[in-house]
From Swiss-Prot:
NCBIfam families: PRK05461.1. Pfam families: DUF525 (PF04379). Residues 2-126 form the ApaG domain. HAMAP family: ApaG. Disulfide bonds: none annotated. This is Protein ApaG. PANTHER family: F-BOX ONLY PROTEIN 3 (PTHR14289), POLYMERASE DELTA-INTERACTING PROTEIN 2 (PTHR14289:SF16). It comes from Pseudomonas aeruginosa (strain ATCC 15692 / DSM 22644 / CIP 104116 / JCM 14847 / LMG 12228 / 1C / PRS 101 / PAO1). It comes from the Bacteria. InterPro entries: ApaG_domain (IPR007474), ApaG_sf (IPR036767), Uncharacterised_ApaG (IPR023065). One of its GO terms (biological process) is error-free translesion synthesis. Signal peptide: none annotated.
Length: 126
């Protein structure tokens, strides 16, 4: 069954932050810019987030919290919300995935999937 009222697309761009990293201390900092597009038929508010962060050694960390960067944006149909945040890994490569918990203006709660994306120091992947 397709729910055309509640469709959210999530895109992520990443970059390595050498100025905030300390490779000799196994500290690799990354920024990620997320674009959340409401492709549904009703306004939707982002209430909370759930991230699963995995480093290159397979260690995982789960992060849950209200909103994103201090906001719980209401996204109109056809509109986008973009924000930038960051994370630090102990390895040169890793990945993130997760979901946003959304609430449609019709009172229906739903999850918007965040597809897995890679974090990698330039040249770390062949």
């Amino acid at each position: 069954m397709s729910d055309t009222q509640h469709q959210v697309n999530v895109r992520v761009d990443t970059r390595y932050l050498p100025e905030q990293s300390a490779p000799e201390q196994n500290r690799f900092a990354f920024a990620y810019t997320v674009t959340i597009e409401n492709q549904g038929e009703v306004p939707a508010q982002l209430l909370s987030r759930h991230w699963i962060i995995t480093d290159g050694d397979g260690r995982t960390q789960e992060v849950r919290g209200a909103g994103v960067v201090g906001e719980q944006p209401l996204i109109a149909p056809g509109a986008q919300h973009t924000y930038t945040s960051g994370t630090v890994l102990a390895t040169r490569v890793g990945s993130m995935r997760g979901s946003y918990q959304m609430l449609g203006s019709d009172g229906i709660a739903f999850d918007a999937a965040i597809p897995v994306f890679r974090l990698a120091v330039p040249g770390a992947l062949h």
